[in-house]
Structures are given as C-alpha cells and as structure tokens.
Amino acid sequence: MSKRVLVSGGSRGIGRATAMVLSAQGYQVVINYLRNHEAATETLGAIEAAGGSAYLLPFDVADREAAKAAITHDIETRGLYWGVVSNAGIAADAAFPLLSGADWDRVLHTNLDAFYNLLQPVVLPMIRAHQGGRIITLSSAAGLVGNRGQTNYAASKAGIIGATKALAQELAKRQITVNSVAPGLIDTDMIAALPKDELRRMIPMQRFGKPEEVAALVAFLLSEAAAYITGQVISVNGGLV
C-alpha cells in the first residue's frame, strides 16, 4: 500500500506542485483545499492521468473543529498518514499603521493557527502507530528576516518556524521528523500582482523560483533518506537571504 501524505492548500501553487511530485514518487496524496474546487479537481485529474493516486479532502485549515473532524474521519476510515505538508497560507499586506485588525487576525489564523489545527489530530495517531512519520511546514523568507508591509505575514511564518523546532524536539525519539521549508520569491499567484522586474533584481540568481523546486525539497524531506534531519529550516530562495 502506498504511503499517504496530506498536503494542505494542495490545489494551487507550491501545494499543487508538491502534490504532483509526491504522486509521481508513489505516494497517495490527500489534497486539502477550501474554496477552489475547480483547481482541486484539475490537480486530482492531472495526478490520475499521470498514473498517480490522490483524493480530495476539503476543509478550512483556520477552522479548528472542521479540520479535526475531517482529518480524524479520514484517518479512521482510510488509515494513518505517513506525512503531512502544512502548506496552506495567505497574505494581506499593508504598512503596519494601516493594517486592520481583521487582516492581522485572518493571516495569523490561516497561517499560524493552522499548525495546531492540522497537526494536532495527526500526531497522536502517528505516535501510537510506532511507524515514524514526516511533518513538513511551509514557512517563508519573511519569517526569517521580516519584510516591509508584511508584519502579519512575517509574524505568522516566524511563529511556524518556532513551533516546528519545538515539535521536532518532542517527536524526535518517536522517529517522526519535523522540518520547515522557507521559500523566497516563487513564481505563483502570490507574487502575480507584485513588481516582478524590481523583485527579480533583488535575487542573486536573477530569477524567481519554480514551485517544483520547492516541491522537490519537500519530497526529499519526506523520504527515508532524510530520516536523520529534523528541527531544520531550509531555504529555497536563489540566495535572497
């Protein structure tokens, strides 16, 4: 039986690329998404057309009860996850004096609270199974060095890094690794409205990253070859930081 991996925000961008790469490597991918059913269905279709295995699991990662119910039911009916990729995230940029409380809360709930909402229902079954496991979180260059106009986003991603390191220490003796991938400027919808020429000049490699390049690192961290790597934050940023 194929190992199963839950990928939150798996319908677009880095999440979609991760789902595609993992399915090509023989994992069964659980594609989480919230609103964009068309994109999720397209991703599922692309995986199946390539001979991979996947299914959809829609829920809001910011909704604690909904996440717990969906994940618990999925584990009880289909079995344990080998890995979880906590990828779903949003941004709502504004200079701090103009940042609304609603946008602060929305970004923290979706990005940081999702760490608890997504992983808390998964960890105890992993421990009880005594089979090890892999947890990968998606942080950001902004979580490492901050970024103007992204106080809320940077706070959420820095929080993910701290939580990742703490959980890694808890789970290491269980052979469950917990690592974070920190992308820089990746060519996804998240940077579509930004001044690309100006941003490109800031990157030592003079180009944006590809979602597949991030996905390749995630796939490695999920593999047996990465069994002795835990509590780490690995950047994919073309030398940006």
Q: Where is each model-derived feature located?
A:
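Conserved glycine-rich cofactor-binding loop
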Residues: 11-12
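Substrate-binding pocket helix/loop in short-chain dehydrogenase/reductase
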Residues: 95-96, 100-108, 191, 199
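Active-site loop immediately N-terminal to the catalytic Tyr-X3-Lys motif
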Residues: 97, 145-151, 173-174, 206, ...
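Alpha-helical segment proximal to the catalytic Tyr-Lys
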Residues: 124, 169-173, 227
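Residue(s) in the substrate-gating loop at a strand-loop-helix junction
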Residues: 140
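C-terminal substrate-recognition "lid" of short-chain dehydrogenase/reductases
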Residues: 210-239
